[in-house]
Amino acid sequence: MGNVPGKEQQVRNARSVSEDYHREGQVRSKRPSAPREKKREPRVFVDPNEQVDGGYLVPQGVYTGPQDFDILVVKSLMTSRKLAPFFKGLQDYEEEWTDHQLMAAIRGFPIPSAASESPTTESTDTKDASASTSTPHAISTPSHLSPPTAPPQVAISPPRHTLSSNNPFRDPLEHMSHLRIDLDNTTFSQSAPTPSWMRSGEPDQEDGDELINPGILQSPPSREAPKPPPSRQRAKTLTNKEPPLMVKIYRDPIECPICFLYYPNSLNMTRCCAQPICSECFVQMKRAEPHPRHDEPEPDTLLGQLDLISEPTACPYCAMSDFGVVYSPRHGPGAKAAGANSADAAAAKGNGDESAIDDSGDSSDGIDTTNMDDVADKLMHMSGAKRRSSISVTNPNVVTVDRVRPDWSKTLAAARARAARKAATANALHATAFVEGGNGEVAGSSRSSRRTRQNHEQRQAARAQELEQIMLSEAMRLSMLESQEAEEKRSREQESK
């Protein structure tokens, strides 16, 4: 029992353990809390399956700034074909470019020369002939040589024309074209009897034909060159006769006057002056930040600071207010919807239909395409007329900046509330300073006469009257703003009618 600690030692050990526990708890409590991770913005990935009229539903990286527009609203407008999709812009374009060169520019490859265009139109028969010629079917040996003891090995040579990895028209099955060899003609066995036409010492011909030198290839007399499968023949025919779909879409493009990139000729058109603008540039436009009115006589006053406005976006070409665009969808090759309609578009393409959009007034998506065509015709007439007219903002086919950024009203309301709180704080500080200054003056002038106290009371009454006038003028200003907004609303309704 000598090893058992005494009672005093047990109490001391318990105290040390409790002190260590409390000390450790304090240390743990004093540890700074880990900083909260900032809320990351959701990343937008390009999905090649989501396409409309040959363009994507997400930006293509023309602008590297923050994409603070409503991406869901933009996708909805593009899917309903009221806004042009995000096309991939071309840095340059030449009318003399061939389909091969244009396809290389679309895919971002170096532009090849017209003379160095790869032989994509080579006939299948030529390749088959070259493949059959390169295969040693039989070797005739002289009479003084013994027949080979081992079966000859088949030498498969690649095709004469190989396509580079940067070729935009590259066939995914091109690397297998040299494997079209009839294995029955090239498979030999030592146990199998030697055909009569391969026997070197016993020729079948009675007239004594000359022996063929060794190393010269011969094909069986009763064999024919293998034919390519029908799918390969069909692919070659389509490649030779018809250019790819993207080449048709990007042929004769137009240049965006803002980003100076070339896009397909079915871009957005401004409602006021019928000028083209791509969707990349359109979604970057926004209203100005809330600011006081510029036409106020004294914008630095309290009333001027409270009256904040956010003016609508003006047209970058003609400076007309309420900037909006109109999109005329493509009719013909490449016209297809995205999302749920991708399967229908693929089925239409498999059936050989060049257009997935009905030319009649009623489309599969419930969109009035006839109305869109009328708007497009009106825009074309506007561009050629001497006196240009504009399409109304209330037109259902016009997409304004406010539709792409619907949170502008919340931003304006927050700015006005912030300015009102700032003004209220300033008024409270001024009133407190005035009251404290008056009390000090009364306490310091205890020996003054009754006349001084009357002056102080008059100043207080004047200050109260001034505050009352400020509140009255603020109420009048708010009522005038409400009446002005009501008049503008009535005028817009009359214009729309």
Swiss-Prot record:
The keyword Cytoplasm applies. It comes from the Eukaryota. Residues 1-52, 112-172, 185-240, 348-371, 438-497 are annotated as: Disordered. GO terms for cellular component: cytoplasm. Signal peptide: none annotated. Keywords: Cytoplasm. It is found in: Cytoplasm. Residues 112-135 have a biased composition (Low complexity). Residues 17-27, 34-44, 486-497 have a biased composition (Basic and acidic residues). Residues 136-146, 185-194 have a biased composition (Polar residues). InterPro entries: Sip5/DA2. Belongs to the SIP5 family. May negatively regulate the SNF1 kinase. This is Protein SIP5.
